[in-house]
UniProtKB/Swiss-Prot annotation:
Primary location class: endoplasmic reticulum
Reactions mediated catalytically: S-ubiquitinyl-[E2 ubiquitin-conjugating enzyme]-L-cysteine + [acceptor protein]-L-lysine = [E2 ubiquitin-conjugating enzyme]-L-cysteine + N(6)-ubiquitinyl-[acceptor protein]-L-lysine
UniProt-annotated location(s): Endoplasmic reticulum membrane
Molecular function as annotated in GO: ubiquitin protein ligase activity; zinc ion binding
Species the sequence originates in: Pongo abelii
Keywords: Acetylation, Endoplasmic reticulum, Membrane, Metal-binding, Transferase, Transmembrane, Transmembrane helix, Ubl conjugation, Ubl conjugation pathway, Zinc, Zinc-finger
UniProt similarity note: Belongs to the DOA10/MARCHF6 family.
Role this protein plays: Endoplasmic reticulum membrane-associated E3 ubiquitin ligase that plays a critical role in mitigating endoplasmic reticulum stress, the regulation of cholesterol and lipid homeostasis, and ferroptosis. Acts as a pivotal component of both the Ac/N-degron pathway (targeting the N-terminal acetyl group of substrates) and the ER-associated protein degradation-cytosol (ERAD-C) pathway (targeting misfolded substrates). For instance, mediates the degradation of Ac/N-degron-bearing proteins such as the G-protein regulator RGS2 and the lipid droplet protein PLIN2.
Phylogenetic placement of the source organism: Eukaryota, Metazoa, Chordata, Craniata, Vertebrata
Name the UniProt record assigns to this protein: E3 ubiquitin-protein ligase MARCHF6
Membrane side Cytoplasmic: residue ranges: 1-91, 164-283, 358-376, 443-480, 541-632, 700-721, 786-815, 870-910
Record GO biological process: ERAD pathway; proteasome-mediated ubiquitin-dependent protein catabolic process; protein K48-linked ubiquitination; protein ubiquitination
Gene giving rise to this polypeptide: MARCHF6
Keyword Transmembrane helix set for record: yes
One Gene Ontology CC term in the entry: endoplasmic reticulum membrane
Length: 910
């Protein structure tokens, strides 16, 4: 039935003509077999693909050249094309050099020089600033310091924009945006004010209906609602007179917002891309952006660094605390923080004065500035000061564990204050992170509402920045003090007290050996690489840790609940859990009635305060209160403390003891860093616990199933051991030895000395190199090694294919490495002596043949790359001068040469 009249184009549905013939360029058949070349080119432009989307066959075009094209391009054409390409490359090189010089040289250098000029504190520095800009002294150091300054200013700018969005979307505090009072001049205000004023009060009024222990919000005490109600009442009494003017200002601001042309902003955002802003598109518009970035840096340095620093400096000098601040080694940071504190106090005082004299615009501006300073200080306290306190407290409580004293810590701080503070801050951050993770784990196990006094980080309504904006300072100060007490008490319970018990019961167990140098015959570098590349990935990549921890917590909770008759309080009752869905629906309906959408007069504040002051957690489950409930809660806390103490004792002793015992078979009586012993012991303990849990899970299935499982796992372990010996033993050893012969030995060992090879160190370095090569291979293009590695990863350990790994991965890699090691050795030791050269020449060849052959291979790769590039240039010159068109190639099923023609350049299809 295939006739010429029935063959139509799959795109335009037209028949072929002598001017526009039909082609069948892919595997597709039927009504979509044929297509016009023009239709296909248009579709390829639209889809931006070079293959058929149905059969995945790549379309092929054959070039059509001018009839007068010579068989070989003339030299002058090649030379002209080469000159043109070189000129284009030079132009791009100059442009990108200018871009790099502007962004990596001018911007950071200008920021650094202006920063130094402002903080020098002399008029002469301002006068000599233009000359200092052109100075080449300390150029690299100033550029690096300037990059840090620019990063800080950009972060400050982004933070300000983000804080503005938080205020716009979350609403400003009630003392900054309060409701307009009712008055008779406008009837709509009489309706708006009571509704807006009751928006947050209804929430607080309905809260006592719930259990008091369940009503506190994240991180707040039960009296939080009373405090907030008092604040709202005081603010309303203080600022009632200014409500009408503020409402008018708000309406004017809303009208201004409506006057913005959103289309113009969208068009500007579309035009300004990263390439255009940075100058990577070839234009010089980026010079304007460089000017604005320099101006922004100067403005932010002046406003956010210079002014607060000098305010704090003058205040400290006036109060006589200058010497104490200088002794802290952080004079600039402390002085700037003091300046911000004084600036916040000044702003809130000026805000109060502006409220009294009814300067409404000034009052709002001062209030917004105070919010910015307040949030900045709270962020510094939450992210900087609190982890630092936790880190130092952890160090102080663990001094006896490392046989250290406060004098040692003082000396280390005096020698390197910045490094010491950073390490303590890092330790504190890790401690806070794992504590928060443990709290999240507890929330998954315990009944909703048990941890009412702690923040719920999983709550979708939880927004710490909004709390920083709305809650007063004394609430944050109270929360900070309580957090310090709680975290400090936990450190005492789980670190200081177990150390005292260990020193009393096992006096020879402590201190831990944490010396940087040891007399062990094993290389520290090898142990570190083994720890980082083998042990830690095996421990951290396991997904069962969270499930095991959750199971332990649940088992402890069930045990404590039945012992103290608190099962209903901790986990809830089963029959009540069945009705939890209805209870949650009722709670949500109750919250929906209370959290009514506020009217315009209240703004966004009432809605946000309804979130901050909402009642108990969503999905609250009632519980049964047994007799002597407070006493049982006290016993529960005591039982929890004892459990944490025992768990801490086990974690501090068992892994280290097991690691020391295992490492003693390897190193003898030599002392090893406790990091390695603890990691080794922890790894062994994890393997033991994992094996025991697996066996316990298999026991209920019967003896035959257990034997079958043991047989399967034994076979899998044998296969894994064989693969580990090949891929984690032989390959890293050969790779490390090759690296030693090619790089290390020629650079470190003179010709008149004999190099010594340590297989253990070579293997450890080979493990590192093998992981790097595997990572680069997986990130690179598709080739046989990447395909094999991806297949091995996809199979996993349980579906390990020993034959496939040995045949496709281990054998080729080991063969290449052995050839790389043996061929140069055979040439140097077997072929060169036959040439009759001297012994010195033989030694030179033997020592330098490995790097020489590496250079030969690299040179051949470079030459091959240059040949390919020249061929591409040749084709490009020929196409530019003589190419007149392209013809679509039909798919030939029998010949199979449908892809023989090279694909056309993209420019020819446009």
């Amino acid at each position: 039935m295939d006739t010429a009249e029935e063959d139509i184009c799959r795109v335009c549905r037209s028949e072929g003509t002598p001017e526009k013939p039909l082609y069948h360029p892919c595997v597709c058949t039927g009504s979509i077999k044929f297509i016009h070349q023009e239709c296909l080119v248009q579709w390829l432009k639209h889809s931006r693909k070079e293959y058929c989307e149905l059969c995945k066959h790549r379309f092929a075009f054959t070039p059509i050249y001018s009839p007068d094209m010579p068989s070989r391009l003339p030299i002058q054409d090649i030379f002209a094309g080469l000159v043109t390409s070189i000129g284009t490359a030079i132009r791009y090189w100059f442009h990108y050099t200018l871009v790099a010089f502007a962004w990596l040289g001018v911007v950071p250098l200008t920021a650094c020089r202006i920063y130094k000029c402002l903080f020098t504190g002399s008029v002469s520095s301002l006068l000599t600033l233009p000359l200092d800009m052109l100075s080449t002294e300390n150029l690299l150091a100033d550029c690096l310091q300037g990059c840090f300054v620019v990063t800080c200013t950009l972060c400050a700018f982004i933070s300000l924009v983000w804080l503005r969005e938080q205020i716009v979307h979350g609403g400003a505090p009630i003392w900054l945006e309060h409701a307009a009072p009712p008055f008779n001049a406008a009837g709509h205000h009489q309706n708006e004010a009571p509704a807006g004023g009751n928006g947050a009060e209804n929430v607080a009024a309905d809260q006592p209906a719930n259990p008091p222990a369940e009503n506190a919000v994240v991180g707040e005490n039960p009296d939080a609602q009373d405090d907030q109600a008092e604040e709202e009442e005081e603010d309303n009494e203080e600022e009632d007179d200014a409500g009408v003017e503020d409402a008018a200002d708000a309406n004017n601001g809303a009208q201004d917002d409506m006057n913005w042309n959103a289309l113009e902003w969208d068009r500007a955002a579309e035009e300004l891309t990263w390439e255009r802003m940075l100058g990577l598109d070839g234009s010089l518009v980026f010079l304007e952006h460089v000017f604005w970035v320099v101006s922004l840096n100067t403005l932010f340095i002046l406003v956010f660094a210079f002014c607060p620093y000098h305010i704090g400096h003058f205040s400290l000098v006036g109060l006589g605390f200058e010497e104490h601040v200088q002794a802290s080694h952080f004079e600039g940071l402390i002085t700037t923080i003091v300046g911000y504190i004084l600036l916040a106090i000044t702003l809130i005082i000026c805000h109060g004065l502006a409220t009294l004299v009814k300067f409404h615009r000034s009052r709002r501006l001062l209030g917004v500035c105070y919010i910015v300073v307040k949030v900045s200080l709270l962020v510094v306290v939450e992210i900087g000061v609190f982890p630092l306190i936790c880190g130092w407290w952890l160090d102080i409580c663990s001094l006896e564990m490392f046989d250290a004293t406060l004098k040692d810590r003082e000396l280390s701080f005096q020698s390197a204050p910045g490094t010491t503070m950073f390490l303590h801050w890092l330790v504190g951050m890790v401690y806070v992170f794992y504590f928060a993770s443990f709290i999240l784990l507890l929330r998954e196990v315990l009944r909703p509402g048990v941890l009412w006094f702690l923040r719920n980080l999983n709550d979708p309504d939880f927004n710490p920045v909004q709390e920083m904006i709305h809650l007063p300072i004394y609430r944050h100060l109270r929360r900070f003090i309580l957090s310090v007490i709680v975290f400090g008490s936990i450190v005492l319970l789980m670190l200081w007290l177990p150390i005292r018990i260990i020193k009393s019961v096992l006096p020879n167990f402590l201190p831990y050996n944490v010396m940087l140098y040891s007399d062990a015959p094993v290389s520290e570098l090898s142990l570190e690489l083994l720890l980082l590349q083998v042990v830690l990935p095996a421990l951290l990549e396991q997904r069962t840790h969270e499930a095991v921890a959750e199971g332990l917590v649940r088992a402890w909770t069930v045990t404590a609940g039945y012992l103290l008759d608190l099962h209903s309080y901790l986990l809830g009752d089963q029959e009540e859990n069945e009705n939890s869905a209805n209870q949650q629906v009722n709670n949500n309906q109750h919250a929906r009635n209370n959290n009514a959408i506020p009217v315009v007069g209240e703004g966004l504040h009432a809605a946000h305060q309804a979130i901050l002051q909402q009642g108990g957690p969503v999905g609250f489950q009632p519980y049964r209160r047994p007799l002597n409930f407070p006493l049982r809660i006290f016993l529960l806390i005591v039982f929890m403390c004892i459990t944490l103490l025992i768990a801490s004792l086990i974690c501090l002793t068992l892994p280290v003891f097991a690691g020391r015992w295992l490492m003693s078979f390897w190193t003898g009586t030599a002392k090893i860093h406790e990091l390695y012993t603890a990691a080794c012991g922890l790894y062994v303990c994890w393997l033991t616990i994992r094996a025991v849990t697996v066996m316990v899970a298999w026991m209920p299935q019967g003896r035959r199933v257990v034997f079958q499982k043991v047989k399967e796992w034994s076979l899998m372990i044998m296969k894994t051991l064989i693969v580990a010996v090949l891929l984690a033993g032989v390959v890293p050893l050969l790779l490390g030895l090759l690296f030693e012969l090619v790089i290390v030995a020629p650079l470190r060992v003179p010709l008149d000395q004999t190099p010594l090879f340590y297989p253990w160190q070579d293997w450890a370095l080979g493990v590192l190199h093998a992981k790097i090569i595997a990572a680069i291979t997986l990130m690179g293009p598709q080739w046989w090694l990447k395909t094999v590695i991806e297949q091995v990863y996809a199979n996993g350990i349980r579906n390990i294919d020993l034959h496939y790994i040995v045949r496709k991965l281990a054998a080729p890699v080991i063969s290449v490495l052995l050839l790389s090691l043996c061929v140069p050795y055979v040439i140097a030791s077997g072929v060169v002596p036959l040439l009759g050269v001297t012994a010195e020449m033989q030694n030179l060849v033997h020592r330098r043949i490995y790097p020489f052959l590496l250079m030969v291979v690299v040179l051949m790769a470079i030459l091959s790359f240059q040949v390919r590039q020249f061929k591409r240039l040749y084709e490009h010159i020929k196409n530019d001068k003589y190419l007149v068109g392209q013809r679509l190639v039909n798919y030939e099923r029998k010949s199979g040469k449908q892809g023989s023609s090279p694909p056309p350049p993209q420019s020819s299809q446009e």
